[in-house]
C-alpha cells in the first residue's frame, strides 16, 4: 500500500516553469522582442515577425536547451504548493524533454528545492503511455492537445495552466486554471 493518496502527473516546461522562461533566450538569439502574448500556438516560430528556418531553430534549440533549462524560472507559487503536496501525493514529472538533459533537469529540481518522487523525460510530446505507466490520477499540463488527449484517453482530470497558446475549447474533464493557487484549490476540493 502506497503512503500517498494519489499520483500526480506533472509537466515541467510551462507548468512548473514559467511559460515565458525560454523567450528571452530566443529573443537574444534571433534579435526579436517576442512576448508571451505573441505566442498563440504551441510553436515559438509562429510568433516571429519574420520567417525562421525550422531546421536552424531546432539545431540552435538542441545546442542550447541544457543551459536554458538550467536557468528556467519556476512558476509563481509552484514550489510552495508542491512542497505542501509532497507528503500527501506522489509527484511524478513527465516531460517532453530529451533524456540527454536528465542530469540538468534533476539538478534544477534539487537547486530550486522543488520536490519530486520521479522524473520521466520521454523525448516527445506524447505523454499518454508514460501517464498510463505511472497510473497518474490527475495531470498538470500547459499544452492544449496533450491536456485534451490525456483527459479523454485516461478519463482523468487534467489541470490546464492558461496561456495564450492553449486557449482553444476543452472538454469538461480539462480544468483551466490561471496559477498554482487555483490548481491547489481544485485539488483540495477533489482529492
Which residues make up each language-model segment?
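Metal-dependent phosphoesterase signature
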Residues: 45-77
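Generic beta-sheet signal
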Residues: 6-8, 91, 139
